[in-house]
């Protein structure tokens, strides 16, 4: 699933703008302008980094990811040997730290299923979840600079004896503080009807402004048009 979206040389992993942008749009259905090839403040999708970690280290019963820096096309990340605490770095600067606990599964079917389900869920939260959620408190993102940034995410399984867990979204939360806010997007993992795990994605929002329905309608229309215009072949 990830071949073609990164390159590795001398033990370091990097991403071109085209690779990162194609992953965002093709795999995650994520049209955040930060992932556009020509973005001035370009960054590699956090979901691509998450996927790379699972692809290399497997799935642990408990995993917590903290995104500490924006990775662009100039960054070459070092992936260390597998430990309970992992840091993806360049020149001692940490871009992503991962804490792992419990047993670890290297089952490829589980890993690929989890990557696919999580990335699809994660990429589709804007605008269809985030905008209505913020609207409940009469605020919205700034359409001129829609700054929605990945802060952290976590997953937890009661056991790893499963190959294709199904991810189900549960009630999101939004904490407003002035012109900034934090969005929490929780979910559960199921095997049939049985809940076997849980997790959450945490995002930071800045430049928050007063809610305007007309502007929201225009923003959603603009976003939907971007999906048509920018969908990779």
Report the location of each language-model feature.
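Glycine-centered secondary-structure boundary/capping sites
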Residues: 36, 76, 138-140
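Long, helix-rich, hydrophobic modules that act as membrane-proximal anchors or helical bundle/coiled-coil regulators
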Residues: 169-171
């Amino acid at each position: 699933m990830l071949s073609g979206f990164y390159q590795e040389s001398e033990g370091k992993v990097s991403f071109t703008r085209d690779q990162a942008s194609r992953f965002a749009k093709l795999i995650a259905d994520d049209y955040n302008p930060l992932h556009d090839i020509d973005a001035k403040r370009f960054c590699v999708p956090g979901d691509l980094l998450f996927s790379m970690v699972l692809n290399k280290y497997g799935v642990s019963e408990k995993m917590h990811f903290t995104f500490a820096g924006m990775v662009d096309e100039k960054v070459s990340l070092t992936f260390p040997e597998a430990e309970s605490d992992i840091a993806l770095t360049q020149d001692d600067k940490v871009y992503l730290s991962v804490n792992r606990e419990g047993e670890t599964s290297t089952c490829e079917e589980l890993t690929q299923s989890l990557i696919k389900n999580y990335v699809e869920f994660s990429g589709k939260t804007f605008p269809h979840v985030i905008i209505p959620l913020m609207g409940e408190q009469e605020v919205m993102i700034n359409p001129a600079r829609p700054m929605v940034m990945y802060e952290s995410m976590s997953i937890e399984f009661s056991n790893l004896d499963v190959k294709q867990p199904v991810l189900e979204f549960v009630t999101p939360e939004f904490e407003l503080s002035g012109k900034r806010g934090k969005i929490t997007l929780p979910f559960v993992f199921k095997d049939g009807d049985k809940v076997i795990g849980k997790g959450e994605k945490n995002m930071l929002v800045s430049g928050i402004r007063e809610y305007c329905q007309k502007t929201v309608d225009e923003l959603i229309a603009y976003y939907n048009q971007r999906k048509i215009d920018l969908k990779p072949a």
